[in-house]
Amino acid sequence: MALIAPSLLAADLARLGEALETIKATGASLVHVDVMDGHFVPDITVGQPVVASLRKATDLVLDVHLLIERPERYVADFVEAGADRLSVHIEATPHLHRALDLIRGRGAKAGVALNPATPIESLAEVWGEIDFVNVLTADPALDEAAFIPASVAKVRAASQAREEHRLGFVLQVEGGVTAANLEELARAGADILVVGSAIFKSVDPQTQLSTMMRKAAGMGLTSKV
């Protein structure tokens, strides 16, 4: 099955249980959780206790995105809380190797996230240590951020780097993803598309998610996580 990763950041945080049920009902296998600290990004969202509660409530794969400063200080806590996949920002730490080693050492999949202005070439020193790359195609924020069309070229560059260096990382895209740009991103090489507002701000989130999953399936997106 094609993989769309619904982002809980766009859901009603007082009704996360219902959001999980909606996701599960569509057959989706992964849910995305954004953790913001108010320093690396202006907003504050959820922490380890919420991730732990989500873990108790669902068997969906928990894809946790740390938008926090010095993430290496907290990766062990989030893996212990139940994160199956954990991504940290290259811009947020001078100790990226350490952060990735800590994640993988705890048994989770290790990813690196890149802000829109950060070039894909910045990952050259850690290509062999990452399980997935999360390319942000909008500036991270609680409010719905505008999709940056120029980011498609970066997705394509990441896909080309994977082929050239014979790497096995999964290519994930997050930020302003909608049914309108899903096809373009898939053709650029995206394996996983993180979708928030386009699902949870719609009139019928379950139907919208199902529709996007069917469209992604037609594009041949990967089901690997």
Regions found by a protein language model. Name each.
Residues 118-121:
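Alpha-helical scaffolding within the catalytic cores
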Residues 16, 88, 135, 195:
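Short beta-strand and adjacent tight-turn residues that come in two discontinuous sequence segments
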Residues 1-87, 93-95, 102-105, 109-110, ...:
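Conserved N-terminal beta1-alpha1 strand-loop-helix module at the mouth
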Residues 2, 140-141:
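A short, mixed-charge helix-start or loop-turn motif at secondary-structure junctions
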Residues 82-83, 137-140:
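Acidic/polar active-site rim loop that often engages polyanionic ligands
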Residues 35, 66, 90, 114-116, ...:
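Short secondary-structure boundary segments
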Residues 132, 138-139, 146-192, 198:
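Active-site/ligand-binding-proximal alpha/beta "capping" segment
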